[in-house]
Amino acid sequence: MYSLELSLRYSPFPLSIQKKEFDDVKRIYDEIKTAMNETLESSNLIELSCDKVQDKLITVRAKEIISVQIYEKSSVAGGAKRPGFSLDID
């Protein structure tokens, strides 16, 4: 299961959806990136659905999206890196 997480302007809580296939989540990720670049003049709406929770739908304005990330949700909890943005400095 792959998760796609959005951070929104002025919102402390991210929105996320889950997809079974990486290709599906990557396609949505690319669509969101394109919409984020095109929002200077318009305010496109993006609708997202979730594979894990069938009735879950999310609609957001593309111009309110600050960041988007993909991560794999594994069933193994031990030793996995915490999802989120991080900076590794050696």
Swiss-Prot record:
Domain of life of the source: Bacteria
NCBIfam families recorded: PRK13683.1
Similarity section: Belongs to the UPF0367 family.
HAMAP family from the UniProt entry: UPF0367
Identification of the protein by name: UPF0367 protein P9301_01411
Record organism: Prochlorococcus marinus (strain MIT 9301)
